[in-house]
Amino acid sequence: MVVAKKSLGQHFLTDESFLDRIVNALPPLNPLKLVEIGVGLGDLTLKLLDRYPLKTYEIDSHLCEKMRSKLKAQKKPFKLELVEKDALFLKEEEPYFLISNLPYYIATRLVLNAFKDPKCRGLLVMTQKEVALKFCAKDSQNALSVLAHTIGNATLLFDVPPSAFSPPPKVFSSVFEVIKEPLKEKALASLAQAPFFEEALQKGFEMLEDFLKACFSSPRKTLSNNLKKSVSYREKLDKVLDFLALENQPTSVRASEIKDYLKLLNYLLKG
């Protein structure tokens, strides 16, 4: 019997109906490689291997050993490449699509890593419902939604109740997908001065992420007040006010009311 480790935030999805819904929600992958974070009890992994070759990152050596034993007992049409490694250090040389039931405590960081990785062309993941709602929120409601919609389209697919897991978490989970769009990535890469596109895209994402941290540092306060507290952006406050005037937005605007952060940051970088 496998005992979930609290230190790794393990809650294993065991409900067959939700496992099937996740697999069926995958978009057409050809020619993308499919990469999974976390093998868990192997239930999702085994279902994926009925349809696709798969590479899985798993930090728990005990779960890796259990998965190897299952594969010996169950022959699958496609092969699994099982990597015993922390997914925070995930690095692929070829374009891939990411799928995972992410541990709550590190889900946001792993999703942002995927956003930043030019080789990742999209993702289908499950997180705590509150986190999924932030990524999939429309317009500029929070920094995570701005980042998600700057690189592509984020869509909330369905909720998963605690009863679908072993052990059950205290909150609902949600499955969402983000499909990256090349034109949006090109606009983001234009923020940075770098000789290669992938390098420019990573740098542009980091620049926008840093700017959004300052803008949303106190969401209930005005954008101007937040930027006044920022060492990096307080000197550009006059340009921010100029931009707001050009966009016919009041100086009392909050961060969540800005319509186009990429346009604003481009304006600030011009001089």
Swiss-Prot record:
InterPro entries tied to this protein: KsgA/Erm, rRNA_Ade_diMease-like_C, rRNA_Ade_Mease_Trfase_CS, rRNA_Ade_methylase_Trfase_N, rRNA_adenine_dimethylase, SAM-dependent_MTases_sf
A single GO molecular function term of this UniProt record: 16S rRNA (adenine(1518)-N(6)/adenine(1519)-N(6))-dimethyltransferase activity
Pfam families attached to this UniProt entry: RrnaAD
Question: Might you give the EC number(s) for this enzyme?
Answer: 2.1.1.182
Query: Between which residues do disulfide bridges form?
Result: none
Superkingdom of the organism of origin = Bacteria
Q: Which residues form the signal peptide?
A: none
Tell where it localizes: Cytoplasm
Q: What class of enzyme is it?
A: transferase
Keyword tags: Cytoplasm, Methyltransferase, RNA-binding, rRNA processing, S-adenosyl-L-methionine, Transferase
Q: PANTHER family from the entry?
A: DIMETHYLADENOSINE TRANSFERASE, DIMETHYLADENOSINE TRANSFERASE-RELATED
Q: What does this protein do?
A: Specifically dimethylates two adjacent adenosines (A1518 and A1519) in the loop of a conserved hairpin near the 3'-end of 16S rRNA in the 30S particle. May play a critical role in biogenesis of 30S subunits.
**UniProt name for this protein:** Ribosomal RNA small subunit methyltransferase A
Q: What is the lineage of its organism?
A: Bacteria, Pseudomonadati, Campylobacterota, Epsilonproteobacteria, Campylobacterales
